[in-house]
Every structure is written in C-alpha cells, then in structure tokens.
Amino acid sequence: MLSPKRTRFRKQHRGRMKGKSCRGNRICFGRYALQALEPAWITARQIEAGRRAITRYARRGGKIWVRIFPDKPVTLRPTETRMGSGKGSPEYWVSVVKPGRILYEMGGVSETVARAAISIAASKMPIRSQFIRLEI
C-alpha cells in the first residue's frame, strides 16, 4: 500500500476541502481517466483496490497511472479510551481529493476496455466520479 517514506511531522490537522481542484485536473499521461466529482478523503486501501481492479481487467495490455498519493496521516484513539492525554497515533494514510481531480489514467487499450476497467475502479471509490477521455 502507498504511504510516504518519511514526513516532516507525524500528525496533521484535518483541514477542510474547499473549492475545486486547481492542479491535477487534466489528463497528462494516458488517453482515458477517472475524474472525481465530489470532495473526499481516499484511503491508501481504496487507491490500491482501484488500481488492482483496473490491472486485473486490462490484463497484459495498457498502462496505468495512479495520479493521487496518500500523504495525509489520519489519527485514531484506541476504543474505550478516556478523553484527554493528547492526540491519537497515526493509523492510516489518505489522499485529499477535491472535485475535478484525476484519480487514475489509462493508455494503450481500446476505449471499451478502458471504460469497463475504470467503471470497476470507480465502484471501489467512496465518491461519484466520471470517465473522461483525451480529446485530440
């Protein structure tokens, strides 16, 4: 699963997801892509599940680019713990996704294969998303 090798700080504020994605919202590598339509935190497990789904469906053909990386630690407190005594320890990593962000890209396959593979990956995501293709 994806996670940073090292970070400057162990814990982060939650932050807020305002507005649309201004970076990473254009197709750069492949011909087809999955684009987010809602804001969300997407976990490293969900990213990996989507990547595996696309890889399995596409078989040997094509290439996949994962355009998001989980770089935000999410902390959790142990269950049945009293309040206080600091913030919990980091449990998993998430990627902050805003509307318009490209999640996956695909190339080297026909549009029908890409559409089917990306729709399977889209069903693994916790948000609404759309299939887009590079207009040439």
From Swiss-Prot:
InterPro entries: Ribosomal_uL16, Ribosomal_uL16_bact-type, Ribosomal_uL16_CS, Ribosomal_uL16_dom, Ribosomal_uL16_sf. GO terms for molecular function: rRNA binding; structural constituent of ribosome. GO terms for biological process: mitochondrial translation. GO terms for cellular component: chloroplast; mitochondrial large ribosomal subunit. The gene is rpl16. Residues 1-20 are annotated as: Disordered. Part of the 50S ribosomal subunit. Belongs to the universal ribosomal protein uL16 family. Keywords: Chloroplast, Plastid, Ribonucleoprotein, Ribosomal protein. It is found in: Plastid, Chloroplast. NCBIfam families: rplP_bact (TIGR01164). HAMAP family: Ribosomal_uL16. PANTHER family: 50S/60S RIBOSOMAL PROTEIN L16, LARGE RIBOSOMAL SUBUNIT PROTEIN UL16M. Disulfide bonds: none annotated. SUPFAM superfamilies: Ribosomal protein L16p/L10e. It comes from the Eukaryota. Pfam families: Ribosomal_L16. This is Large ribosomal subunit protein uL16c.
